[in-house]
Amino acid sequence: MKKTPRKVYVVDNGFVTSKAFSLSDNLGRLLENQVFIELVRRGYDVERTMFYYRSRNDKEVDFVLRKGVHIERLVQVCYDMSNPKTEKREVDSIVECAGELKCNNLVIVTNNDKRTIEKDGYQIDVVPISEF
């Protein structure tokens, strides 16, 4: 695995919004932070079981969840995938990382989208944050 820069998360989205200049520009980042908080609540640990990954072609996945030595799940976060270019970028990223990491349990967390996407033999569950 290639070493990547660490991402920084805060435990309270209220802190982020109080310091943000434009809330609309940060909705995706706030959603990603909310997913991070939920994963920590579920027991994932940033030092042992929860990672960020960048592929050989610079595609990224927000969360790689590990159980023991096995990759359990890949989680991508995207506030709004209504733009076809955005959807393509997010789907291509998670599929490429899934291939490199040999993981079939893929999810994209969104603000309110719910569906299943199939690409290159992978099934990706798209779920709203309220159901994550």
Indicate residue ranges for each PLM-predicted region.
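Active-site-adjacent loop/helix micro-motif of nuclease/hydrolase catalytic cores
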Residues: 82-92
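Active-site ExK catalytic segment of metal-dependent nucleases
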Residues: 71-83
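Short, glycine/serine-rich, charged loops/turns that create anion-binding
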Residues: 15, 57, 79-82, 113
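Domain-level recognition of nuclease-like catalytic cores that cleave nucleotide substrates
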Residues: 111-132
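Short, hydrophobic beta-strand segments that form beta-sheet elements in well-ordered domains
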Residues: 104-110
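Accessory nucleic acid-recognition modules appended to NTPase machines
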Residues: 1-71
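Arginine/glycine-rich "motif VI" loop of SF2 helicases in the C-terminal RecA-like domain
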Residues: 41-45, 93-103
